[in-house]
Amino acid sequence: TRSKLKLEFDDEKKIITLITPGNNKIVISDDQKSILLQDQNSNKIELNSSGIIIDSPKDIKISAKGKVTIDAVGNIESTAQADIKNQGLNINHQANIGFSAKGNATAELSASGQTTVKGGIVMIN
């Protein structure tokens, strides 16, 4: 168009591409079985046969007025090269079989109020 908006159709590969002058784009591809949403800041969301990829060179924020639920049939994994922080009114962790918490350098369990450690057999050291 006059303002450099592009809408491209590839009938052979069955791909529709929408590109703005600022290089924001949406690509719908039957050939690659994917949908790509990408902005000029290199943030992108890709849906393909492997799943959904959300990628950003900066922060990603998820916010809700209600609750946020993450559910998986397989594992849920989180890793960070810096700290991982959880904060809430109460934090509850429960394992159906085994629970392990380990600090390679240090570990601390503390409370300003009562601290309870329970188990069939409690071993310290």
Could you say what each language-model-derived stretch is?
Residues 1-125:
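Right-handed beta-helix
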